Amino acid sequence: MSLGIPLSQLIVESPKPLSSGITGLDEILNLGFQARSIYEIFGPPGIGKTNFGIQLVCNSLEGIQQSEINDDKILWIETFQEMPINILRERFQKFKIVEENVKRVRITKFGQLLYFFQNLFKLSQSVRYKLVIIDGFSQLVCDHLCTLSKRGGGMIDKTIHELKCRHLILIFTVMTKYTHSTGSTIIVLNDCMNTAFQSNEFESLEEYYEILDDGSNFFVNSNNERRKNNVHILKSALVANIAMGSKDSTWEVFLRDRIGLFRDWNEQVDETVFVKSKRVKASSSQSNEGCTTIKEMRINKRNFENLRIAIVFNLHGEDRKREGRNLKRSRSSDDRNYIVKFDFDKATGQLRDIIDLKPDTANIASFPTLSTSSSSCSQVFNNIDSNDNPLPNAEGKEEIIYDSEG
């Protein structure tokens, strides 16, 4: 089978990038998802991978609506979860445009997917899909690897890893030929997996791992003593599976970018300062006359807001900032990964940007903080003079008697 791409297919005008609807992410991706490219989006269950794919479909349909003559179609490949078509019904009042331009197909085997793309490439002159989304691609790959491992009587990690790389190279080669012949964009939606999952002994997994009691079977702890000090990292299920190894770069070259979706917390500082007056009674004193009045200059109140983040992994070490037509190379991983904050807007049903509101902390550093590491109040407040005047705007003062021996 020929793996080459005719040069005439490359010397054409590039179509307009497909917007994700998240401004910060589009800026990193050079105005959006590029044509003739394959992207991987992975994340834990419930993070919104399918909703992200639906939003790409909606943005593509809106572009079709604006174009009077457009023969481009959208293909959604279902694996083990049906496409949420009801979201498109709510989004588009004229559902006819969805029925005419969005095609769905269900594939549950890795071999079926490979055969499907081989035939799709042969029919690329008659049927052209502008956008192809595969929801659950990693699950097809993992099931395929498990079947091969059981059929082979329990392959060693090196053998199954090399087999995984060869099969991914094969299917990504067919996908790449299709994207370059039609100018389409392929998005694969994958799960993520804990990197501690490395054993291929399916019958004895309980001896190595225990399920955390958090209501899900997602995070696990290692029971094996030699794995106790390992750091568990969430990675794409194409990488972290029973076929982990060091040669994943051989098939990652087919991906333009890898985007990880995770949850995070946005810290917001409330600048309201709470002032309290406290009287500390010495252990030798029997009355309140021996109490010393001190002022505590509170601790800033912090609120944590739940949100989502998208981490863009630049797999090929290319700097996003172009100098002319040349791409700059970067060896530092910190320079290659970009983080974008976003969340799901319930009002519009779309993913949106989050703008950080950073408070002015210029005066916060001048306030002394309260230390709780020592039981001696004289050591805690040794920098505060008891004869100072009360602070302005000291509303809601509170007097508390502390026994230094307590």
Swiss-Prot record:
UniProt region (Disordered), positions on chain: 385-406
Keyword annotations of the record: ATP-binding, DNA damage, DNA repair, Nucleotide-binding, Nucleus
Keyword Nucleus found: yes
Subcellular location: Nucleus
Annotated InterPro entries: HR_Repair_Mediator, KaiC-like_dom, P-loop_NTPase, RecA_ATP-bd
SUPFAM superfamilies (alphabetical): P-loop containing nucleoside triphosphate hydrolases
Predominant place of localization: nucleus
Name of the protein this chain belongs to: DNA repair protein RAD55
Organism: Saccharomyces cerevisiae (strain ATCC 204508 / S288c)
